[in-house]
């Protein structure tokens, strides 16, 4: 019956497709992405969890941040460092996608790729797709990042401790609507050059000591434009096709972490993007119903780079031991990380914002030598227990942490490959975390390699 329809097929005036509710929902939703996010102040071992999940992923994407993130992945004894490239680029069967929420320093991107090529990374350009809406980080953004830190030091006697990669200044340009994007670089270059010059002059008027080789930078950018042109796609259409075409496994690799989020982190000592789950939707251009599992990555203790409140910090032998045993210095900056006990107030707060479906607890083996292990379970302010994580930094500096002391296991866990291999006290520690946060631990990390991530379910 082409072109005609029985009148009782549908109510008068109804158009479109008639389906049952469940089919409608499935058709409308499409595939769901799996998200890996940091649940503390970064450096939790997200790269390792991504690496595990990336082995059978079809697409691995980054949705925010820039080359201020640092992910280390060890494969076949080789250590790869990723900052801007999704760490899933190692997987030769998958496509890596840099979303619109990421800010891209092109010289940094190629430098990073070349460094990893020397370690054995091959054909990455054929597997990388870049959103045309991603903003560009220019060399002068990086210079300004350094100048702003000097200013803060002079004015307030303290700085934020940025990575000086130009991330904050680029997101500032984006919010001020003066930034330039990949799509601008790839269209009319004269128009791009004129906007680039305006942006450079604006920064020079704010920072009189700032020197910018405008012509030199434009020449380099023109060269980079041709190199990246084959990799650039409209990110919205790319993600839509990926979600609604043949079923695909899509993995999103969060950079930074919950407590560094521009809205929910320990402001102002945060990064300039949303590194909580909302940043996935805005940074890739996908709706909330396409978010599937959200895995929170947590270190078995707490670390923080740079300044800012850190309630469970241990400036003592314990802190020193955690730093030495855990090799706690930054991948991007080489700075020493401050160390302290696991803080469950932070973890519960990160769960409220992100809605974790499961946790990965990493670096459990670092606690192997301790006779007892403390865990921060609540905060007191002026002698009264407070049921929330304070937004105000001065208040957070003043909180007194209430600890629970658990027995240590004093045994080497690095050889453990199953739950049963872990000492009862280590199992008890993991169950304690689960019960207090209300989220199951899916993986436990006891070493550097892929094999040392014990999967519990």
Curated annotation (Swiss-Prot):
SUPFAM superfamilies: P-loop containing nucleoside triphosphate hydrolases. It is found in: Cytoplasm. The gene is ADSS1. Pathway: Purine metabolism; AMP biosynthesis via de novo pathway; AMP from IMP: step 1/2. It holds the Pfam family Adenylsucc_synt. Belongs to the adenylosuccinate synthetase family. InterPro entries: Adenylosuccin_syn_GTP-bd, Adenylosuccin_syn_Lys_AS, Adenylosuccinate_synth_dom1, Adenylosuccinate_synth_dom2, Adenylosuccinate_synth_dom3, Adenylosuccinate_synthetase, AdSS_1_vert, P-loop_NTPase. Binds 1 Mg(2+) ion per subunit. SMART domains: Adenylsucc_synt. Component of the purine nucleotide cycle (PNC), which interconverts IMP and AMP to regulate the nucleotide levels in various tissues, and which contributes to glycolysis and ammoniagenesis. Catalyzes the first committed step in the biosynthesis of AMP from IMP. IMP binds at residues 43-46, 68-71, 163, 177, 256, 271, 335. It is linked to Myopathy, distal, 5: A form of distal myopathy, a group of muscular disorders characterized by progressive muscular weakness and muscle atrophy beginning in the hands, the legs or the feet. MPD5 is an autosomal recessive form, predominantly affecting the lower limbs. One of its GO terms (biological process) is immune system process. The active site is at 43 (proton acceptor), 71 (proton donor). Predominantly expressed in skeletal muscle and heart, as well as in several hematopoietic cell lines and solid tumors. It is an enzyme of class 6 (ligase). Homodimer. GTP binds at residues 42-48, 70-72, 337, 363-365, 445-448. It comes from Homo sapiens (Human). PANTHER family: ADENYLOSUCCINATE SYNTHETASE, ADENYLOSUCCINATE SYNTHETASE ISOZYME 1. One of its GO terms (cellular component) is cytosol. This is Adenylosuccinate synthetase isozyme 1. The lineage of its organism: Eukaryota, Metazoa, Chordata, Craniata, Vertebrata. HAMAP family: Adenylosucc_synth, Adenylosucc_synth_vert_basic. Its EC number is 6.3.4.4. Residues 1-21 are annotated as: Disordered. It catalyses: IMP + L-aspartate + GTP = N(6)-(1,2-dicarboxyethyl)-AMP + GDP + phosphate + 2 H(+).
């Amino acid at each position: 019956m082409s072109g005609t329809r029985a009148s009782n097929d549908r109510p008068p005036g109804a158009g479109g497709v008639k389906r049952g509710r469940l089919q409608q929902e499935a058709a409308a939703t499409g595939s769901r992405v799996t998200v890996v996010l940091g649940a503390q102040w970064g450096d939790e071992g997200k790269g390792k969890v991504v690496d595990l999940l990336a082995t059978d992923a079809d697409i691995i994407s980054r949705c925010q941040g820039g080359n201020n993130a640092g992910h280390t992945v060890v494969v076949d004894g080789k250590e790869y460092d990723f900052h801007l490239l999704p760490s899933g680029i190692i997987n030769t069967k998958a496509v890596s996608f840099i979303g619109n929420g990421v800010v891209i320093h092109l010289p940094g991107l190629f430098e990073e790729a070349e460094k990893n090529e020397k370690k054995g990374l091959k054909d990455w350009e054929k597997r990388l797709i870049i959103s045309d809406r991603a903003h560009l980080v220019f060399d002068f953004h990086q210079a300004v990042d350094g100048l702003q830190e000097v200013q803060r030091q002079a004015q307030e006697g303290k700085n934020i401790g940025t990575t000086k990669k130009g991330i904050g200044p680029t997101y500032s340009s984006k919010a001020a609507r003066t930034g330039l994007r990949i799509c601008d670089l790839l269209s009319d270059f004269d128009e791009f050059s004129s906007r680039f010059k305006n942006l450079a002059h604006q920064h020079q008027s704010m920072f009189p000591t700032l020197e910018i080789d405008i012509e030199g930078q434009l020449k380099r950018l023109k060269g980079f434009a041709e190199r990246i042109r084959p990799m650039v796609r409209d990110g919205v259409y790319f993600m839509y096709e990926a979600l609604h075409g043949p079923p695909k496994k899509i993995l999103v690799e969060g950079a930074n972490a919950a407590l560094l989020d521009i809205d929910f982190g320990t402001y102002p000592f945060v990064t300039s993007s949303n590194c909580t789950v909302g940043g996935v939707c805005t940074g890739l251009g996908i709706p909330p119903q396409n978010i599937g599992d959200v895995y929170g990555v947590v270190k078995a203790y707490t670390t923080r780079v740079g300044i800012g409140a850190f309630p469970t910090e241990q400036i003592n032998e314990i802190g020193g031991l955690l730093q030495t045993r855990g090799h706690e210095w930054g991948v991007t900056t080489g700075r020493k990380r401050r160390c302290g006990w696991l803080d469950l107030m932070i973890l519960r707060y990160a769960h409220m914002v992100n809605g974790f479906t499961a946790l990965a607890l990493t670096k459990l083996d670092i606690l192997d030598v301790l006779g007892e292990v403390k865990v921060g379970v609540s905060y007191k302010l002026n002698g009264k227990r407070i049921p929330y994580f304070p937004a105000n930094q001065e208040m957070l500096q003043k909180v007194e942490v209430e600890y629970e002391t658990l027995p240590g296991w004093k045994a080497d866990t690095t050889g453990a490959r199953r739950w049963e291999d872990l000492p009862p006290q280590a199992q008890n520690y993991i169950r304690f975390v689960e019960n207090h946060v209300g989220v199951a631990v899916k993986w436990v990390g006891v070493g550097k390699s892929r094999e040392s991530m014990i999967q519990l379910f």
